[in-house]
Amino acid sequence: MNDYRRFLTFVFLLMISGSAALAQELMKVAGLVVDQNADPLIGVTVRVQGDNKGGTVTDMDGNFTIHVQKGKTLVFSYLGYKNKEVLANSSKLKITLHEDNKVLDDVVVVGYGVQKKSSVTGAISQVKKEDMENRTITNAKSALQGKTAGVQIVSSSARPGSSPTVRIRGFSSNGSSDPLYVVDGVRLGDISGIDPNDIASMEVLKDAASAAIYGAEAGNGVVLITTKKGTVGSGKITYDFQYAIESLAKKPKLLNAEEYIQYMKEGKTFTEDYLLKNWDGTTNTSWVDAIYGKGKMQKHNLGFTGGNQNGNYYLSLTYLDNDGMVKGSNDLYRRLTATINAEYQIKPWLKVGTTNQIEKYNARSVSEGNEYGSMMAAVLSMDPLTPVAYEGGNLPVHVASALANGKHLLTNAAGNYYGVSAFYAGEQFNPFVMRDNSVSRNSGFNVNGSIYADFKPIKDLVITSRFGYRLSGTRSSSTSLPFYGNATQSRDYVDQSASSSTSIYYQWENFANYMKKLGDHTVNAMVGMSFQESTYDYVQGGLQSNGEDAVKKNNPLFYYLNFASASATKSVGGEKTRSAKYSYFGRLSYDYRNRYYLQASLRADAADLSKLPATNRWGYFPAVSGGWTISEEKFFEPLRDVVTSLKLRASWGQNGSLAALSGYAYSTDMAQGGIYPLVPGNNYTTSVSPSSMGNDKLKWETSEQTDLGIDALLFAGRMNFSMDYFVKKTKDLLVSGTTPSLVIGGTTSPINAGNVSNKGFEFELGWRDNIGDFSYSVRGNLATLKNEVTYLDPSLTRLQGTTFMNVPLTYFEKGYPVYYFRGYQFTGIDPKTGDPTFADLNDSGDLTDDDKMDLGSAIPNFTYGITLTAAYKGFDLAVFGSGASGNKIFNCINRTDFPMVNKMKELFYDDRWTESNPNGSKPRAGANNMDKYATSSAMVYDGSYFKIKQIQLGYSLPRTLLKKVAINNLRLYVSLDDFFTITKYPGFDPEVSTNDVVGMGIDKGGYPTSRKVVMGFNLEF
């Protein structure tokens, strides 16, 4: 019994001593984790090496506490930074983590998946969130400008809320050349409702091999947008504020009163007596200064983000209020957007998530871009002798007469009547009257997003099911008010119109990704299917006045269709359309030792009968690509100290497009005609005949593209370089207007009858480095482009495009760029008469259409962009510029069929022919053939430009100061946006165009670009 007790006592003492020894070895380690700039890192994982279950994370100040046995190794890991291992031999640690540039840049988004950047074999460019943050852009498309080679941004207007057009590797069609936008896997026709602040990255799929997985929708390239998601770590609250003051970037020089009088007298447009009789002798109106003032923009963004190992969330709310430069309240854009993203790992084999973007907007805008009556054109056309308004009630005779005859003269806020020109009575009149003679309301909403689930039934296999949706609606109304602009432009009664549209789109996609690594071999396979359906409902109504107002009372409360007056003529119309598409797709990739890469993909798309006949509804779009990382070869080892990585790429593929097709364009339609007495008596029979001929052979437009590329990293990754050469051939363009049958007559349906070629080089070069506390980077890109129509149906010599004063200016013709400029070649001024002269190319003695020639193209020979950044301690500087060269602009602002309109000095007044200046380079005032002059090479200008889009200086307050008030980060900044432009173009802005491909480079007086002084701050809790 005593022996047993002694044994138990021994065991008890042994356990106590062992526990004491263990307690002595287990120690508390506390510390701080910072980055290279000594800023705390939040959410860094701290664990004991070999223990994958325990551990901790750093708090919002970068601090951590962990209990560990002395001598064990602690591992510190954080996304985007290199892991660090430290022995636990001290109770206090300060850990500095360094960015892992390879990790930060290693992944790019591709169709239905992601790829390591090192394994990409196609031409993919990436724009990161850093390129969009703190810019005054309100549209995500603008973030692409100058940031990646081969992408051109074309703007038809700079009005608040306007959306530019994106062109990837040229212009491939006589119809739409817009790329496909895919936001978090959901296809969108427009991304204007996505706030740039909510975007994590944008990938531009430029070559056919990268975009072929989207098949029939990818003929003009693809832009993949990934919105922000939550990150692992403690939650963050952010608030970003931005305020901008806008003013005209450039003021065109117009004739002042003295110059206008002189020019009118020289041209015998008006006699001196008439001019002096109808001018008060003092008025010298600058309509540009009168109508444009200071615009303002403010933007607020509130964000919440966070997550853990199982899930994350990102919530964002943005409000934008942009009051444009046109004085008054008819030039504004207000938008409220929200982003709600979340995902959660429910089981080790199941992850679910959702992405959602919501937009609500209201807009008012002024008329622009139309030579036949727009406010913007009126600013450049109105004479300087007419006042903005008549002060003191002193009305000239012609105005008093109009008032006495019951005309509705509008007044300003002070009750003074707006000025009415006694010299010009065309489509343009006082810009303030054009601004105020109607009340327009435009509003709408967009809701788009997805719900998805990722299943992992076995190792290396992920099956994704994703339902995407897009709902949008627009509401607009226009009240045309009584006004008097001049003797030819007036309205006596109120008219009312309104429209409403709703669009519903959904897609359901199921696809599987399988990745298997077998020794040195890695295989990735993806297969899937997709179904898409969209519906569109549209309804419109109108009230036309008949001897009295079309509404019961001329009051804003009655500007609705349901307040129609008894005499109003009512009209209503509308339509509903539906289309659907079914698809199968697959991709196979092979990688050997990160050295050799092969990839092949195929997509099969089937359009429904609303687009194509049953015989041609299926389209097949294959692609292959390969890559060779030469730097992984043994023979390359001597060069690796300089060239870190060098890869060659090659790809070929096909994509399609149906953008130029309307519903049932291939069908033969019948229409009722006249009535005929084909039987005796008074019985008449209504005739029916084909209104269109139909085309059961109609098929997809197809783009075929070959790409050769080089990617290189040099000097330990500090320098990166890429180059691509591409040849893109688009065939079977959809063309209308071919010659119909002379027997049957009627109009023809579209046929596949055109081919276009685009080819060029793309270069991207970057350098980044740091010298102590000073870091800097330089990035530049340049792209060349040669565009040509290579085939057009023999029945068509050329297709007409945009006109000016009813004269066609642009054409689609074999052997020339898409919609090039065509007109008379101006050869100079006849020194005897002062009239313009033109080249008589066929020596007929008369100027005919056969004498017109190629006057250039709006497509640049090359585009480029450059970005400079620098940072020193808390200060940071960013400078960004972009430009284009070789493009032409057709100036169509000044109407020569109305010689009494005002003139741009550089175009008509300076160095004009006079008796004392017989060698002048501009026609005399009142010259003959001015209609031909206005549509000749004389009005075609070099559109090359370089713009410094942004100069921004920021300062981040020290964290040691901010932590005392529970603030994690506070950055203040000021910026000058679009302040400096180098160009020879005399108009408002060299970045001009009409709103479609047929009017590229045509300047008809669009809303001009503003320059902005910007102030803002970024706050993070």
What are these regions (language model features)?
Residues 1-339, 344-353, 448-449, 774, ...:
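Short, small/polar-rich motifs associated with maturation and membrane association
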Residues 132, 178, 184, 298, ...:
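Extracellular/periplasmic, surface-exposed regions of secreted and cell-surface proteins
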Residues 270-283, 299, 372-433, 437-439:
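Acidic, glycine-rich flexible loop segments
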Residues 238-280, 367-376, 539-547, 664-665, ...:
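Conserved small-residue
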Residues 843, 877-946:
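C-terminal beta-barrel architecture of Gram-negative outer-membrane proteins
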Residues 43, 106, 126, 150, ...:
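Extracellular/lumenal ectodomain signal focusing on beta-strand-rich modules
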Residues 38, 62, 185, 392-393, ...:
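Detector for glycine-centered tight turns/loop "hinges" at secondary-structure junctions
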